């Protein structure tokens, strides 16, 4: 899948790199207009900063909420990073499907969302990097 960036996203990426000095892999707006930055492995600490200082600085300068996610070449670990801070019992799967086992019904509801919107959003993010069919929650 070919990824295209508009001027606005390029500006956000530049600002992110200038403030955090972390190597950025990708940047996009999700369905909820949340600006999501995907950083390379082992760069998450540098991107967040002490006590979330850099995140707060970025949110203030960009005037919007942001989410920073660490990329992982392992599909299941990347999925865990995407759904963080929600806790799960396990994330399992094969090469085409991912099955997330929620701890309780509240977490399950937050993972799925109304009309499975949250789940489809997570699925679209994972599909940007891995060839999967679907994500399911048990």
What are these regions (language model features)?
Residues 1-138:
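RNA-contacting regions in translation and RNA-metabolism proteins
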């Amino acid at each position: 899948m070919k990824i295209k960036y508009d001027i606005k996203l390029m500006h956000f990426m530049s600002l992110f790199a200038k403030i955090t000095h972390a190597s950025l892999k990708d940047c996009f707006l999700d369905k909820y207009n949340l600006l999501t930055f995907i950083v390379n492995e082992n760069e998450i600490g540098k991107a967040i900063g002490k006590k979330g200082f850099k995140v707060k600085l970025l949110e203030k300068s960009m005037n919007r909420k942001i989410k920073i996610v660490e990329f992982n070449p392992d599909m299941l670990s990347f999925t865990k990073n995407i759904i963080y801070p929600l806790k799960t019992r396990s994330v399992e799967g094969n090469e085409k499907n991912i099955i997330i086992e929620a701890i309780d019904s509240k977490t399950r509801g937050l993972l799925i969302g109304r009309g499975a919107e949250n789940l489809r959003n997570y699925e679209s993010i994972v599909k940007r990097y891995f060839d999967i069919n679907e994500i399911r929650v048990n």
